[in-house]
């Protein structure tokens, strides 16, 4: 009897355990099923989104292939330039042969069936009619390629000199751009003539009669040296000789231009491609001279130079002070953007009254002369070619002209 009760109790206990286990199984099974369904639903949604994105990509790709890509103006100019380089590799007999000479090829020729070096401009720029060409010029035994794009009112490649003149109204007094001796000359102490090159800021001194642009460093960094330190027979010691052609300064400027100095760098290769040769005026001048047209200094000059120094007349013309007349006038320090306070720097003009003195801008900002063997800062001048294009900028120190 007791055994019967035990068996019944064991059976009830076992059934109770089975019921509890079943309840546990049912409770734990429900969340697992929900997670699985959610995972499958997420995968399905992800798959649908991925499929939609693939379809969109294919549609865009097909549209690009069938309709053609709409390039930016800068990209079109680069396409023009690259095509012209390939063109002249084939037609090298058409390249300019002499220094300064130019040759050009238009976009129609580059895109023609004969060459197929680029797509027609109509397929590169949509909803705008454009004409284009590339001018190649031989400068310092290198070929410089300049693309021109004219899309009417929408866009037009603009040379820097044109932009400078358009942004700086010609004035006859005060700060600004003046017409002097057939050139456009910046004068005054507050002028918007900053240009950004790879190594720093430069100032535009003037735009020449053939639209080239004379630059001088704003002098963020500098290098000092003698103008010349040779033995001078007239003076009886190594005071230097004030003739530019055989001077130490000429050698130093060549090293600066070629970037051969270890602790000073003025230019990058991309900057040199924008420069052109010029006549460097090296004529001597008296302290009392009042002719500031450049005729005195340019009575003697070196042609085909890539680097030089500022002339005395160019510095004098930078001042708007009416009393700045002769070479050593102290008034030339007034209203003159070329002045750098507490900084003395060499000019390219030598004194005409002896064989050892050269003019320099002293720490106060007016001209004095000293032995060529003196130590002063070198502030080189460079000439931007007239085909250099502007990318942006207003010419201010904070927003300088940026070149293409």
Where are these regions (language model features)?
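Structured segments of extracytoplasmic/periplasmic soluble domains
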Residues: 83-90, 113-116, 207, 218, ...
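Hydrophobic alpha-helical membrane-insertion segments, chiefly the h-region
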Residues: 54-65
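Short, surface-exposed interaction loops/tails
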Residues: 2-4, 124-158, 374, 378, ...
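N-terminal Sec-pathway targeting helices
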Residues: 36-54
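Conserved hydrophobic/amphipathic alpha-helical signal-anchor segments
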Residues: 63-103
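N-terminal targeting leaders characterized by basic, low-complexity, disordered sequences
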Residues: 1-32
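Collagenous Gly-X-Y triple-helix signature in extracellular proteins
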Residues: 154-404
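Extracellular/periplasmic head regions of type IV pilus-like filament subunits
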Residues: 96-133, 253, 299
């Amino acid at each position: 009897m007791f055994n019967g009760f035990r068996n019944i109790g064991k059976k009830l206990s076992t059934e109770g355990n089975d019921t509890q286990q079943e309840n546990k199984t049912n409770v734990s099974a429900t969340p697992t099923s929900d997670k699985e369904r959610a995972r499958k639903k997420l995968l399905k949604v992800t798959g649908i989104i991925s499929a939609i994105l693939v379809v969109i990509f294919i549609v865009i790709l097909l549209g690009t292939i069938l309709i053609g890509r709409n390039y930016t103006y800068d990209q079109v100019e680069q396409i023009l330039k690259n095509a012209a380089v390939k063109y002249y590799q084939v037609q090298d007999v058409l390249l300019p042969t002499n220094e300064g000479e130019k040759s050009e090829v238009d976009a129609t020729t580059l895109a023609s069936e004969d060459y197929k070096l680029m797509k027609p401009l109509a397929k590169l720029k949509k909803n705008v009619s454009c004409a284009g060409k590339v001018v190649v010029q031989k400068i310092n035994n290198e070929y410089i390629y300049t693309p021109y794009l004219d899309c009417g009112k929408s866009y037009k490649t603009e040379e820097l000199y044109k932009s400078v003149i358009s942004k700086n109204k010609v004035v006859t007094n005060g700060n600004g751009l003046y017409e002097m001796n057939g050139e456009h000359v910046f004068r005054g102490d507050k002028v918007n003539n900053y240009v950004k090159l790879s190594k720093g800021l430069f100032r535009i001194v003037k735009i020449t009669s053939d639209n080239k642009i004379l630059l001088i460093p704003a002098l963020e960094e500098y290098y000092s040296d003698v103008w010349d330190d040779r033995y001078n027979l007239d003076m009886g010691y190594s005071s230097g000789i004030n003739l530019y052609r055989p001077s130490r300064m000429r050698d130093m400027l060549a090293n600066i231009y070629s970037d051969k100095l270890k602790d000073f760098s003025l230019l990058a290769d991309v900057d040199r491609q924008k420069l052109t040769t010029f006549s460097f005026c090296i004529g001597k001048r008296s302290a009392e001279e009042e002719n500031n047209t450049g005729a005195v200094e340019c009575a003697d000059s070196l042609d085909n130079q890539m680097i030089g120094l500022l002339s005395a007349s160019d510095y004098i013309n930078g001042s708007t002070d009416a009393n700045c007349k002769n070479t050593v006038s102290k008034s030339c320090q007034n209203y003159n953007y070329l002045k750098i306070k507490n900084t003395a720097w060499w000019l390219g003009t030598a004194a005409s009254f002896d064989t050892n003195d050269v003019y320099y801008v002293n720490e106060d900002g007016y001209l004095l002369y000293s032995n060529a063997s003196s130590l002063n800062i070198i502030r080189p001048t460079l000439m931007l070619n007239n085909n250099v294009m502007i990318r942006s900028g207003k010419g201010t120190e904070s927003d300088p002209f940026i070149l293409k």
